[in-house]
Amino acid sequence: MKTYRRQIREKILQALYTLELRDTDIESAANWLLTKEIQEDPNAMKFFNLLLKNIKEHREEIDQYIARHTFNWDMSRIAIIDKNILRMALAELLYCEDIPPKVSINEAIEIAKKFSSTDKSSKFVNGILDAIFNELKAEGKIHKNGRGLIDHSAIKLQKESETPE
């Protein structure tokens, strides 16, 4: 089974970019961009719908994280592509429990290399995401399961309960 996650991320980025330039809704913009293969794959569509929903529903919160970590930049001055790559990656970090943080960050960097207009964009995206990820981790706001991230606290509790007293 082929995975379409990179393609989906790219299509969502294109839809987010379209939203910045036109008066349309995100679902229409994104659905118009999807390939037939993605539309016919239930797992791909599940990921597409989840990521799109989380970006849309949590955009204000996500933008606050970005604004806090781009001290020298007003949100309006950040390149549209970079800003939307950050939004997409943060939606994954915060709300897609089965995607490891490193995958979300690496995908964002690779997409920045492909779509951004300067070589510095991927470094900018990496630096901002790394800082936000460290903050989220310190605050205990990263909740991953399955393949996403091992819950070390649960393992520690399990080992402690197995230790004879």
Swiss-Prot record:
Cited Pfam families: NusB
Keyword Phosphoprotein: no
Sorted UniProt keywords: RNA-binding, Transcription, Transcription antitermination, Transcription regulation
Domain of life: Bacteria
One record GO biological process: transcription antitermination
Any one Gene Ontology molecular-function term assigned to this protein's record: RNA binding
Record GO cellular component, one term: cytosol
Family note: Belongs to the NusB family.
Function noted in UniProt: Involved in transcription antitermination. Required for transcription of ribosomal RNA (rRNA) genes. Binds specifically to the boxA antiterminator sequence of the ribosomal RNA (rrn) operons.
Listed PANTHER family: ANTITERMINATION NUSB DOMAIN-CONTAINING PROTEIN, N UTILIZATION SUBSTANCE PROTEIN B-RELATED
Protein name: Transcription antitermination protein NusB
Native species: Chlorobium phaeobacteroides (strain DSM 266 / SMG 266 / 2430)
